[in-house]
């Protein structure tokens, strides 16, 4: 699996200390700009950065210029120094200290070779010793104890040896060196003795030599010749001939690397642009990694992390990838899968047959999420895997579970402090809260009727008086100018007169008098009255003395209204520093979740310390404090119905922590309840929920026994089908997988006139939306004779075959019964979908959850299978109906049965929804209405035709058998019992139909020919007895029968009444016209067409067919926009989707596409497939 790419044409070396890689411009190449510059660069490989930007490394950590280009590069620790050494085309040895590289002046350059240095190798037994090999057979041994003063010693020169292409020190025996040369000679040296020990020779150039990691006499040489691209395995105990040959490359091999931790892995690459993985022990090629566009000249495993290796090619890339591919291997992909893998088409396609030695588990047990433990025991080569429950410190969550159920009474049973009293008051309602705040409950007193005169009316002034019109106030009153009169009263400080006058004046005058009053009064009462009267209670909150906090809170509760929560929280903020308990009361009464949770969350650590003083373990103390916090929060939310307000990220983190702890104890249901409280946008919550949902699924079995494999895990190969642990729930659409259950038959409806058989074609339906069940009509075909073969009437929109309860289940024309190996009901004659059982235990090669491809459609099984739609076997065979057999019905138009049970590439059932009467078919429920056979719907994967060709056609099942001539079964005469049916072999679904004279074998993949087939054979085969009809209503009288029967042995064809012509379509603009797109839809067309034009050049040629098809379908969408056919909601969603593509926000674009397809399937036509492919291609390419 590709992890990183470096855009450099360079040789490279892995760092022995950390995940870094050094690159040096390779010799013998020319850049696109014909530059002769050379760079030495060091790159940080951050495997945690999985972004699209992080995939391609563009910024080296260190970059310096070099005087010459490199043939080879090594990075090695000598003990005191970390050295990078380069073999250059100028013949000089360049040495850098990796930790001190600043520029080219920091290198030490030594020239001893007379020509270019081709290869370098450090001695694993002597870290300061380096050997270099070059042209003309020159080999030098270097002492790098002091990197600034390298000391060289010539090992030997053999002019016949040619250029030294590769060096390798023996991994076991000290001082043993192997050198390979361009003339095919591989020489074994004793470096200390400067002595040649032996040679192995090949008649072709040898490009690379490697020693076996653990066997001192074994080595491999690679041949660079295109005519014989092989790797030879030698054992020096007999060097006369190679011990084995590894063949697989089509051109010369340039580089080989033998894994030091597991000798069963060997990498090779060469001129055929390929990188192969081998098992040298079995001489088997394990697989091929993604091919480059040019020669791959070096491949090397990382010594610290052998799962990783890098390959350099003349394509201009260094690719860093893993040994094991986790993207599904070479499994055949469906059309929809191609685009998901478009961006990874050149990645590895290898599934290792054995686990690397460094991954073989040294233990035999493993803990699993959700309080599970897996134990493995191996006896006599057989491994037994057991999955059980494991609980460490049992946590008590009963009280929280009770609260979540809504029962708060138990939470207040114990005396737990002042906060719990407040919570209890909140849980009991308003009266209890008023009582807690010492606010008396005002009871309404019954009104007392008093007919006596108003006592105050007797207190009115009486007697004669003078108006004193000269008084300005009196004059203003007389003239009705009350505002002026009030102003004069206020000016003379006559507040009582002003209040009396304001009663008859406007509200503005009243406010003026009140303000004047409050301005002159300084008492607390006046301040309080002002706050209440002007609704400025924040003045009381901010300025009143905190010793009266409870009275302030009561005032706020009485007059605060909608602002009470905010005002009470503000009062709590004032109290928090000086009086934590009273502040908590204010927060609780305010109902502010953020304030309450923030206060309690800050006290968790303090509570932990208190618990640890009582010799409680730190983890137990932490969980106890966390549990108290969660319990109080849960009670608070239930008591006040508090909603998330403000910033409650701290609370969400505590919810998640608590959920993880209880999930680890196996209480997955409680954990799910708390994760459900987190918003979907909260970071990481989606992954947590997915993990919980998977863990909560019931396992099929807790014990699995199988042969032990090389992975240390069971080898699953049993052909015995496993029972599925999942039973689909019946829905309004019925279930095509639900077992057939006998049900009481409903009385049959009266038959309408025979013209009901002519069903007008229905418009084509969306192939990607689940099909609703077919409507039930009142028409029932004529009843069959008890002795006649059972008719298998089929409705294209209701594919489940129906059975006549009055027809015998076995006869000479019966097809062989089929049996679904999974015990689910599938129509007879249809393909049975089988899938490999899913294993409950994970192994090395198991794919990640997000990488598992959707289930593929299996091919129909040609072997004899028995039908799962056969009626249940009765306890005793049924007796034939009383009376003579009735003649077979004639002139019946039926359609053949349609196989059901497959799914298309988008996960929806093929063939429509199952019949809602499937369970009643064997017990006499009426068969569905015969339907006119119509042309099949368009193939969702075929290229779209031009809009002018898209005539609306009725939708039928694309896998329906080809209709043919009706062949009448032989008549059964009265008193003559039909011969016993013989079990016949099932018809080959791929064979051509036989001639007329025998019931034609149906081909489920043949296109309709326009005729009508006779009734297929019943599902129950010969030898099987149908169950007796149980408490069923007699069938209704059928439509009038045609008195003319077809001649014996000949086909009977029935004319089909033509369907009424569809209404004329509204005038549309011509296809391809884009001038009438409304302004609201114009941005959709502009954005999609522009982005599509930019994306197309980046899609590989192999997908050209899909590109053309997608483009045609997109043009259909543009035609709809041009005709203003789209609904406003659809236009809005398409606008969002196009903007997401333009902004490269592909997850949002994919989510919007899925939302459109599922929420409005009726509005989605053929263009939706093109839009889906557009989004998938864009997400795969990502940048253009």
UniProtKB/Swiss-Prot annotation:
> Per its UniProt record, what Pfam families does this chain match?
WD40
List the PROSITE patterns.
Answer: WD_REPEATS_1, WD_REPEATS_2, WD_REPEATS_REGION
Give the residue ranges for region: Disordered. Answer: 692-723, 751-1079
Topology of the protein relative to the lipid bilayer: Peripheral membrane protein
Q: What is this protein called?
A: Protein transport protein SEC31
Residues folding into a coiled coil are none
UniProt biased composition (Low complexity): 695-710, 780-791, 958-967, 985-1000, 1008-1019
Q: Where is the composition biased (Polar residues)?
A: 792-806
Source species taxonomy = Eukaryota, Fungi, Dikarya, Ascomycota, Saccharomycotina
Q: Which family does it belong to?
A: Belongs to the WD repeat SEC31 family.
GO CC annotation: COPII vesicle coat; endoplasmic reticulum exit site; endoplasmic reticulum membrane
> Which GO terms of type biological process are on file?
COPII-coated vesicle cargo loading; endoplasmic reticulum organization; positive regulation of ER to Golgi vesicle-mediated transport; positive regulation of protein exit from endoplasmic reticulum; protein transport
Subunit-level organization: The COPII coat is composed of at least 5 proteins: the SEC23/24 complex, the SEC13/31 complex, and the protein SAR1. SEC13 and SEC31 make a 2:2 tetramer that forms the edge element of the COPII outer coat. The tetramer self-assembles in multiple copies to form the complete polyhedral cage. Interacts (via WD 8) with SEC13.
Indicate yes or no for the key word Endoplasmic reticulum: yes
Which InterPro entries has this protein been placed in? SEC31-like, WD40/YVTN_repeat-like_dom_sf, WD40_repeat_dom_sf, WD40_rpt
Q: What does this protein do?
A: Component of the coat protein complex II (COPII) which promotes the formation of transport vesicles from the endoplasmic reticulum (ER). The coat has two main functions, the physical deformation of the endoplasmic reticulum membrane into vesicles and the selection of cargo molecules.
- Keyword set includes Membrane: yes
**Locations listed in the record:** Cytoplasmic vesicle, COPII-coated vesicle membrane; Endoplasmic reticulum membrane
Give the GO molecular function terms.
Answer: structural molecule activity
Q: Where do the WD repeats start and stop?
A: 4-44, 65-106, 112-152, 159-199, 201-244, 248-288, 291-331, 366-388
Q: Per the record, where are the segments of Pro residues compositional bias?
A: 751-763, 851-863, 871-888, 927-941, 968-981, 1026-1050
Q: Which UniProt keywords apply?
A: Cytoplasmic vesicle, Endoplasmic reticulum, ER-Golgi transport, Membrane, Protein transport, Repeat, Transport, WD repeat
């Amino acid at each position: 699996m590709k992890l990183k790419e470096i855009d450099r044409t360079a040789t490279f070396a892995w760092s022995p200390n950390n995940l870094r890689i050094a690159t040096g411009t390779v010799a013998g190449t020319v850049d696109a700009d014909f530059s002769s510059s050379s760079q030495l660069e060091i790159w940080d490989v951050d495997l945690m950065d999985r972004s699209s930007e992080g995939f391609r490394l563009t910024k080296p950590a260190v970059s310096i210029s070099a005087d010459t280009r490199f043939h080879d590069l090594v990075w090695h620790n000598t003990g005191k120094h970390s050295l990078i050494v380069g073999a250059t085309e100028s013949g000089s040895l360049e040495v850098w200290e990796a930790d001190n590289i600043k520029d080219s002046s920091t290198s030490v350059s030594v020239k001893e070779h007379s020509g270019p240095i081709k290869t370098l190798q450090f001695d694993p037994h002597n870290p300061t010793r380096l050997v270099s090999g070059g042209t003309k057979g020159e080999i030098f041994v270097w002492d790098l104890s002091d990197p600034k003063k390298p000391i060289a010693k010539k090992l030997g020169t053999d002019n016949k040896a040619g250029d030294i292409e590769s060096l390798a020190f023996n991994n076991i025996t000290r001082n043993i060196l192997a050198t390979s040369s361009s003339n095919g000679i591989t020489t074994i040296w004793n470096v200390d003795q400067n002595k040649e020990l032996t040679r192995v020779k090949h008649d072709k150039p040898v490009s690379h030599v490697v020693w076996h990691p653990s066997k001192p006499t074994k080595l491999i040489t690679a041949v660079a010749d295109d005519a014989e691209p092989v790797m030879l395995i030698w054992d020096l105990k007999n060097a006369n001939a190679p011990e084995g040959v590894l063949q697989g490359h089509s051109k010369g091999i340039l580089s080989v690397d033998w894994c030091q931790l597991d000798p069963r892995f060997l990498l090779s690459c060469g001129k055929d642009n390929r990188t192969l993985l081998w098992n040298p022990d079995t001489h088997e090629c394990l697989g091929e990694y993604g091919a480059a566009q040019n020669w791959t000249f070096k491949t090397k495993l990382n010594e610290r992390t052998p799962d990783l290796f890098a390959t350099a090619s003349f394509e201009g890339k260094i690719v860093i990838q893993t040994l094991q591919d986790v993207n599904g291997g070479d499994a055949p992909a469906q059309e929809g899968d191609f685009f998901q893998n478009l961006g990874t088409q050149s990645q590895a396609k290898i599934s290792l047959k054995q686990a690397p030695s460094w991954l073989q588990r040294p233990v035999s047990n493993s803990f699993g999420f959700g309080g599970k433990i897996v134990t493995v025991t191996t006896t006599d080569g057989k491994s037994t895997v057991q999955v059980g429950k494991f609980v460490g410190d049992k946590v008590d969550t009963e009280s929280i579970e009770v609260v979540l159920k809504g029962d708060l009474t138990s939470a207040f049973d114990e005396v737990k402090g002042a906060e719990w009293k407040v919570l209890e008051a909140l849980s009991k309602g308003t009266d209890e809260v008023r009582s807690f705040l010492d606010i008396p409950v005002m009871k309404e007193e019954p009104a007392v009727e008093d007919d006596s005169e108003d006592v105050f009316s007797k207190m009115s002034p009486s007697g004669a008086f003078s108006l004193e019109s000269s008084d300005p106030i009196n004059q203003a009153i007389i003239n009705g100018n009350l505002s002026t009169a009030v102003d004069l009263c206020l000016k003379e400080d006559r507040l009582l007169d002003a209040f009396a006058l304001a009663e008859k004046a406007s509200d503005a005058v009243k406010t003026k008098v009140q303000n004047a009053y409050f301005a002159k009064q300084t008492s607390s009462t006046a301040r309080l009255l002002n706050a209440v009267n002007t609704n400025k209670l924040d003045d009381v909150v901010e300025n009143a003395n905190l010793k009266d906090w409870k009275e302030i809170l009561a005032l706020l509760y009485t007059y605060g209204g909608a602002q009470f929560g905010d005002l009470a929280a503000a009062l709590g903020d004032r109290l928090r520093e000086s009086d934590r308990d009273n502040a908590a009361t204010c927060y609780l009464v305010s109902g502010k979740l953020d304030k309450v949770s923030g206060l309690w969350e800050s006290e968790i650590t303090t509570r932990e310390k208190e618990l640890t003083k009582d010799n409680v373990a730190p983890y137990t103390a932490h969980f106890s404090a966390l549990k108290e916090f969660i319990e109080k929060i849960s009670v608070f939310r239930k008591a006040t119905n508090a909603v998330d307000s403000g910033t409650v990220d701290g609370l969400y983190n505590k919810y998640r922590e608590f959920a993880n702890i209880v999930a680890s104890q196996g209480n997955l249901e409680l954990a799910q309840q708390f994760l459900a409280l987190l918003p979907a946008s909260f970071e990481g919550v989606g992954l947590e929920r997915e993990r919980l949902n998977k863990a909560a699924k019931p396992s099929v079995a807790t014990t699995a026994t199988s042969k032990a494999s090389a992975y240390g895990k069971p080898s699953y190969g049993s052909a015995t089908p496993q029972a599925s642990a999942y039973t689909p729930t019946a829905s309004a659409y019925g279930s095509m997988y639900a077992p057939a259950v006998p049900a009481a038959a409903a009385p049959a409806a009266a038959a309408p006139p025979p013209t009901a058989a002519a069903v007008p074609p229905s418009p084509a339906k969306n192939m990607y939306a689940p099909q609703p069940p077919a409507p039930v009509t009142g028409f029932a075909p004529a009843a069959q004779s008890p002795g006649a073969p059972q008719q298998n009437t089929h409705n294209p929109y209701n594919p489940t075959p129906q059975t006549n309860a009055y027809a015998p289940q076995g006869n000479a024309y019966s097809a062989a019964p089929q049996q679904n190996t999974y015990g689910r009901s599938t129509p007879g004659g249809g393909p049975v979908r089988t899938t490999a059982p899913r294993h409950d235990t994970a192994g090395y090669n198991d794919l990640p959850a997000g990488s598992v491809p959707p289930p593929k459609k299996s091919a129909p099984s040609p072997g004899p299978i028995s039908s799962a739609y056969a009626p249940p076997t009765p306890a005793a065979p049924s007796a034939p109906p009383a009376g003579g057999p009735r003649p077979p019905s004639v002139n019946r138009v039926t359609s053949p049965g349609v196989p059901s049970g497959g799914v298309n590439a988008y996960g929806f059932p093929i063939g429509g929804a199952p019949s809602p009467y499937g369970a009643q078919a064997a017990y006499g429920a009426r068969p569905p209405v015969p339907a006119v056979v119509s042309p099949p719907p368009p193939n969702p994967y075929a290229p779209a035709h031009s809009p002018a060709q898209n005539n609306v056609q009725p939708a039928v099942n694309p896998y329906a058998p080809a209709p043919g001539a009706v062949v009448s079964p032989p008549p059964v005469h009265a008193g003559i019992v039909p011969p016993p049916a013989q079990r016949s072999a099932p018809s080959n679904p791929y064979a051509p139909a036989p001639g007329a004279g025998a019931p034609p074998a149906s081909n489920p993949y043949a296109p309709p020919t326009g005729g009508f087939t006779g009734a297929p054979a019943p599902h129950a085969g010969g030898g099987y007895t149908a169950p007796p009809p149980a408490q069923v209503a007699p069938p209704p009288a059928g439509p009038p029968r045609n008195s003319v029967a077809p001649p014996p042995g000949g086909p009977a064809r029935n004319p089909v009444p033509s369907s009424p012509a569809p209404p004329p379509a509204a005038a549309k603009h011509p296809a391809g016209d884009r001038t009438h797109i409304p302004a609201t839809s114009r941005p959709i067309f502009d954005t999609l067409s522009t982005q599509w034009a930019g994306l197309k050049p980046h899609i590989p040629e192999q997908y050209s067919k899909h590109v053309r098809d997608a483009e045609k379908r997109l043009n259909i969408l543009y035609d709809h926009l041009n005709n203003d056919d789209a609904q406003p909601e659809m236009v809005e969603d398409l606008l969002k989707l196009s903007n997401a593509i333009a902004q490269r926000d592909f997850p949002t674009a994919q989510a919007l596409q899925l939302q459109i397809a599922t929420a409005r399937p009726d509005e989605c036509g053929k263009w939706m497939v093109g839009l889906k492919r557009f989004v998938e291609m864009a997400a795969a390419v990502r940048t253009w």
